[in-house]
């Protein structure tokens, strides 16, 4: 099957050499894979519109790679809108959780939900993500905090992945918080001895993550969990240096993690260690926005030679499914250049998920995952903050969303 997206104002080519804008460009996709990218006349000489099975007229619009969201908590039950008002009155994240709210509130809702209910709730969120241009997304567990509930969450992710165009990458985050009925070290024992073996044996996750921070898990507890994950074939990831500095970024470097995420309290030494080990920093500007705290500093990592990835951190406490909004916050809040933000939301986001098939790029041989944005140049996407610019989304060359 041949798909031709033709006559665009801009085609944003993204590959190992960086970002290159083709003015007046087209893209041809053959059997799900990008076959040609370039000026419209050149592409259509080999792939004429008249002979294509599917065509997308992108006149006046911009074509770019489908967004990759490398950090979400999109599978959950219940909402926490009441806590939104509490935060606006000055209550901290830690205060709310200490009173049984926050993560523990969502845990209660998840434990009361069926796998089918969790799957359907996730599918609804994925529909929103797709409308905003996301074509690949990581989804973490972590709102179960027991073997049965964590398995239920990851089984819901697997079932949703069978039904939805967005490719889902599952992450086990049993160490998201300490359950209300457990002592921290005893719960770590349960994660290591019960949850991890069961999750790995069922092939329900690719990554093992841990929340190494104040009110969650210590450095030593995090090490134990991630090393156990490695023993079971799961690549490590880590929530690090969000509220407190616990050397989580250096632990990520030591263990060869795919990414270290959040990093609001990271230091130049952390960035240097991550660079030495090629650990991708994943910055989550939506979280800083939701918590009303200072943003992470992307230059800390860029100066160390690292490429910065962006993610939504979509969860009940950071309720945005939009990578467009994440890019806008990255530019306006973290002062990232639009080109860096776009690569962070595509190419570098895919690197944070250890994807090596060309996902997140737009080049010959890459998956035919595209966004057609209703703007004349890509800089309008972060510039026009809060407005959805995505009009058409293609997955493997098939139109899966169109306004």
Where do the language-model regions lie?
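Active-site-adjacent beta->alpha loops and helix N-cap segments on the catalytic face
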Residues: 89, 147-151, 216-222, 267-276, ...
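Metal-associated gating/positioning segment near the N- to mid-region
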Residues: 49-50, 58-121
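Active-site-adjacent C-terminal substructures of enzyme catalytic domains
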Residues: 235, 247-361, 374-375, 399-400
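C-terminal cap of metal-dependent C-N hydrolases
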Residues: 345-347, 367-403
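Divalent metal-coordination and catalytic microenvironments
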Residues: 8, 27, 32, 60, ...
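Short, small/polar residue-rich loop motifs at catalytic or cofactor-binding pockets
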Residues: 20-23, 49-50, 386-388
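N-terminal metal-binding scaffold of metallo-dependent hydrolase/deaminase domains
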Residues: 1-46
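Metal-coordinating catalytic core of metallo-dependent amide/deamination hydrolases
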Residues: 109-121, 135-243
């Amino acid at each position: 099957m041949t798909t031709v997206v033709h006559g665009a104002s801009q085609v944003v080519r993204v590959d190992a050499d960086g970002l290159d804008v083709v003015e007046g460009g087209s893209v041809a996709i053959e059997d799900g894979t990008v076959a040609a990218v370039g000026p419209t006349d050149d592409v259509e000489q080999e792939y004429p519109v008249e002979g294509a099975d599917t065509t997308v007229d992108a006149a006046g619009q911009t074509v770019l790679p489908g967004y990759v969201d490398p950090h979400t908590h999109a599978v959950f039950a219940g909402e926490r809108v009441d806590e939104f008002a509490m935060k606006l009155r000055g209550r901290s994240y830690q205060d709310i959780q200490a009173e049984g709210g926050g993560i523990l509130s969502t845990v209660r809702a998840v434990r009361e939900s069926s796998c089918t209910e969790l799957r359907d709730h996730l599918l609804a969120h994925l529909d929103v993500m797709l409308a905003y241009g996301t074509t690949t997304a990581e989804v973490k567990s972590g709102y179960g905090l027991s073997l049965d509930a964590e398995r239920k969450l990851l089984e819901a992710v697997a079932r949703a992945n069978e039904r939805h165009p967005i490719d889902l990458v599952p992450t086990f985050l049993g160490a998201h918080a300490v359950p209300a009925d457990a002592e921290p070290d005893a719960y770590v024992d349960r994660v290591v001895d019960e949850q991890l073996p069961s999750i790995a044996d069922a092939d329900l996750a690719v990554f093992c993550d841990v929340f190494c921070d104040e009110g969650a898990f210590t450095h030593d507890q995090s090490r134990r969990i991630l090393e156990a994950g490695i023993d079971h074939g799961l690549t490590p990831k880590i929530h690090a240096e969000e509220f407190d500095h616990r050397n989580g970024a250096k632990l990520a470097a030591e263990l060869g993690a795919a990414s270290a995420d959040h990093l609001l309290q990271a230091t130049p030494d952390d960035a240097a260690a991550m660079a030495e080990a090629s650990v991708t920093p994943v910055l989550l500007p939506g979280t800083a926005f939701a918590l009303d705290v200072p943003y992470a500093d992307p230059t800390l990592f860029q100066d160390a030679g690292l490429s910065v990835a962006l993610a939504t951190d979509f969860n009940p406490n950071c309720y945005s499914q939009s990578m467009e909004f994440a890019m806008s916050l990255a530019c306006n809040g973290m002062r990232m250049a639009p080109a860096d933000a776009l690569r962070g939301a595509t190419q570098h986001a895919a690197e944070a998920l250890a994807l090596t098939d060309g996902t997140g790029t737009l080049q010959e041989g890459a998956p035919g995952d595209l966004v057609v944005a209703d703007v004349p140049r890509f800089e309008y996407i972060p510039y026009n903050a809060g407005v959805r610019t995505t009009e058409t989304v293609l997955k493997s060359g098939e139109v899966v969303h169109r306004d």
